[in-house]
């Protein structure tokens, strides 16, 4: 009997040792940069391998501030990839201290300029050559972190058996200060950080069980715009296969500026910090001498006007990363032609109104007076002259009930969302689909049951992300069973699209997500209800933003009387009416 027990214990001990050896071999990966040791993390009823904080570039510190990234030099020994890395230096939202709704987007690790790292989640056992999905965070190009709880890749990687990567990139002036012509601060280095991370993934992901030929990049807001920018940029096109854009596209009005405007903002930053402005060299030297927080504290001062949904340091159309203007590239088909999946949320504007428009509060219904509505319109369309503002007001006012505070509130939500997210994305998708080979469009209109923001904010910008990353699968977070099912469905759509270029299962009996075509323009709702197919998302408003208003502003750009402050003249009103009639006719 004792011999049997001893023998059984020996076998058990041998199995434990073998399991530990298997765990160790799964967690130790030899990349082209060097060896990395990951960690085993629990996920639902199982576990997954995580490799956190792998460097892909040299730290952009000291004289490397504002410069293009340089590849990480190979290291000896084993890199400890068991904890999240630093977050990049950035503006921290302190509007609502202690409020989880806003603080969930703030950095959750120490901030540092040494921040160019990526994180990888790998199914266990390690796959042979599986699909790879690379996440690019949003944050208006002034904020964002790969380490946020809402971006935890373990649920999506585990549930859909994909390798999930999240990368980091410099934001604010650190990533997008642009003095065109200077090698010391060329601009767009945040986008080049992203590209360098994609290059690292391309060169190394096979060692983690991923297939470098089936990489899908996906992102939200500025991350979605970034994804679109890599579709456009010739230097990025070979580093991924497919793309998903959530609530952002490269042509959004806040997502880029001219090189001249980029330079003006860089000089204005220096002026705010008492730098010598005699030359680029002196300006850059001065800005490099400043502490990071000094730059962050004054970055909002460089904007040319008071506005909502505009950010200080963003990509510039430089002739290099972007060979020509975005519109000319879209018109000519000068972009990567592949399958894309993209969409928007129902209430894209509400979050931004809370941070700048008069009359809005998270602690009330935010019923908006007519006076506050008019002020909000001016902040929402800061580039428009008075006639343009009148056109926006006319388009979004219920003139049978123009003093209704709820309608005024919801009208501003629609103005900000249509102008900054929905209609730019619709313009992009229509242009892209003429040349691409498979497009799928969604409209996310489910408000989470546990959302802490007030009801009036609706289905908020950014709040589809938790469904994409599988948070409703976590029982402790108090989502409903229907929301868990929605999250599983969205994850499966995203992953199936990444694997095949089509979000639909080939032999499924469920309703099919139809292709978007320029003729029919079909899209689906994403919510807890059975699938519904619609056509021509926000078409009336998007014709206004994408066609009518630009022509109106162009036609009146040189007319001082029509652009003067105060109420438009009778001449302006007559001009507007005639222009509208002619536009509708022709």
From Swiss-Prot:
Q: Which domain of life is it from?
A: Eukaryota
Which residues constitute the catalytic centre?
221 (acyl-ester intermediate), 348 (charge relay system), 461 (charge relay system)
Q: Which PROSITE patterns match?
A: CARBOXYLESTERASE_B_1 (PS00122), CARBOXYLESTERASE_B_2 (PS00941)
The protein's recorded glycosylation sites are: 80, 437, 478, 554
Q: Which residues form a coiled coil?
A: none
GO cellular-component term (any): synaptic cleft
Where exactly are the transmembrane stretches of this chain?
Answer: none
Q: Which InterPro entries does the record match to this protein?
A: AB_hydrolase_fold (IPR029058), AChE-related_enzymes (IPR050654), Acylcholinesterase_fish/snake (IPR000908), CarbesteraseB (IPR002018), Carboxylesterase_B_AS (IPR019826), Carboxylesterase_B_CS (IPR019819), Cholinesterase (IPR000997)
Look up the signal peptide feature and give its range. Answer: 1-21
User: Which reaction is the catalytic activity of this chain?
Assistant: acetylcholine + H2O = choline + acetate + H(+)
Q: Which GO terms describe its molecular function?
A: acetylcholinesterase activity
Q: How is its activity regulated?
A: Inhibited by substrate concentrations above 0.5 mM.
Enzyme Commission number, as recorded = 3.1.1.7
Fetch the SUPFAM superfamilies from UniProt. alpha/beta-Hydrolases (SSF53474)
- Give the propeptide positions: 565-586
Q: List the disulfide bonds.
A: 88-115, 275-286, 423-542
Quote the annotated effect of residue 446 to Q: Almost no loss of activity
PTM field: An interchain disulfide bond is present in what becomes position 593 of the T isoform.
Per the record, lipidation of type GPI-anchor amidated serine is found at 564
Report where it is expressed, by tissue: Found in the synapses and to a lower extent in extrajunctional areas of muscle and nerve, and on erythrocyte membranes.
* A Gene Ontology biological process term: acetylcholine catabolic process in synaptic cleft
Keywords of this entry = Cell membrane, Disulfide bond, Glycoprotein, GPI-anchor, Hydrolase, Lipoprotein, Membrane, Neurotransmitter degradation, Serine esterase, Signal, Synapse
Q: Subunit arrangement? A: Isoform H form is a homodimer; the asymmetric form is a disulfide-bonded oligomer composed of a collagenic subunit (Q) and a variable number of T catalytic subunits.
> What function does this protein fulfil?
Terminates signal transduction at the neuromuscular junction by rapid hydrolysis of the acetylcholine released into the synaptic cleft. May be involved in cell-cell interactions.
Q: Which family does it belong to?
A: Belongs to the type-B carboxylesterase/lipase family.
Q: Know the name of this protein? A: Acetylcholinesterase
């Amino acid at each position: 009997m004792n011999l049997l027990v001893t023998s059984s214990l020996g076998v058990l001990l041998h199995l434990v040792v073998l399991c530990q050896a298997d765990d160790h071999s799964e967690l130790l990966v030899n990349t082209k940069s060097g060896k990395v040791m990951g960690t085993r993390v629990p996920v639902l009823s199982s576990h997954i391998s995580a490799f956190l904080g792998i460097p892909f570039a040299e730290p952009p510190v000291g004289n490397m501030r504002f410069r293009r990234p340089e590849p990480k030099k190979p290291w000896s020994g084993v890199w400890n990839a068991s904890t999240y890395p630093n977050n990049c230096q950035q503006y921290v939202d302190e509007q609502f201290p202690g409020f989880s709704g806003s603080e969930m987007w703030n950095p959750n690790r120490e901030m540092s300029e040494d921040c160019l790292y990526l994180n990888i989640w790998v199914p266990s056992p390690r796959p042979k050559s599986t699909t790879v999905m690379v996440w690019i965070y949003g944050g208006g190009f002034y904020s964002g972190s790969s380490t946020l709880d809402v971006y935890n890749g373990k649920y999506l990687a585990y549930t859909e058996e994909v390798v999930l990567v999240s990368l980091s990139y410099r934001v604010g002036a650190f990533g997008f200060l642009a003095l065109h012509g200077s090698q010391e601060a060329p601009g767009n280095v945040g986008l080049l950080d992203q590209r360098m991370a994609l290059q690292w993934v391309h060169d190394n992901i096979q060692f983690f069980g991923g297939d470098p030929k089936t990489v899908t990049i996906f992102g939200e807001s500025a991350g979605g715009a970034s994804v679109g920018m890599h579709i456009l940029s010739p230097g990025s096109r070979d580093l991924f296969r497919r793309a998903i854009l959530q609530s952002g596209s490269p042509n959004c009005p806040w997502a880029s500026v001219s090189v001249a405007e980029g330079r003006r903002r860089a000089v204005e930053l220096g002026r705010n910090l008492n730098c010598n402005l005699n030359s680029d060299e002196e300006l850059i030297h001065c800005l490099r001498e400043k502490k990071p927080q000094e730059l962050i504290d004054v970055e909002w001062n460089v904007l040319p006007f008071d506005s909502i949904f505009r950010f200080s340091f963003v990509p510039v159309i430089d002739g290099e990363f972007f060979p020509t203007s975005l519109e000319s590239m879209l018109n000519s088909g000068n972009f990567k032609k592949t399958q894309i999946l993209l969409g928007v949320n129902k209430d894209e504007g509400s979050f931004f109104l809370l941070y700048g428009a008069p009359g809005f509060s998270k602690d009330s219904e935010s019923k908006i007076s007519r006076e506050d509505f008019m002020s909000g319109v001016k902040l929402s369309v800061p580039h428009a002259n008075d006639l343009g503002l009148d056109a926006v007001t006319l388009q979004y006012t219920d003139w049978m009930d123009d003093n209704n505070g709820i309608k005024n509130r919801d009208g501003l939500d629609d103005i900000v969302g249509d102008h900054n997210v929905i209609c730019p994305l619709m313009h992009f998708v229509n242009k892209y689909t003429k040349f691409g080979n498979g497009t799928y469009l969604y409209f996310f209109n489910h408000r989470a049951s546990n959302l802490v923001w007030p009801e009036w904010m609706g289905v908020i910008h950014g709040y589809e992300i938790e469904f994409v990353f599988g948070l409703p699968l976590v029982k402790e977070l108090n989502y409903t069973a229907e929301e868990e099912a929605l999250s599983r469905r969205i994850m499966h759509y995203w992953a199936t699209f990444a694997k095949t270029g089509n979000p639909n299962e080939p032999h499924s009996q469920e309703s099919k997500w139809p292709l978007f075509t320029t003729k029919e323009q079909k899209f689906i709702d994403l919510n807890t209800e059975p699938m519904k197919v619609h056509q021509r998302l926000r078409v009336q408003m998007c014709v206004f933003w994408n066609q009518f208003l630009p022509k109106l502003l162009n036609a009146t750009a040189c007319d001082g009387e029509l652009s003067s402050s105060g109420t438009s003249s009778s001449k302006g009103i007559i001009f507007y009416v005639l222009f509208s009639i002619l536009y509708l006719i022709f």
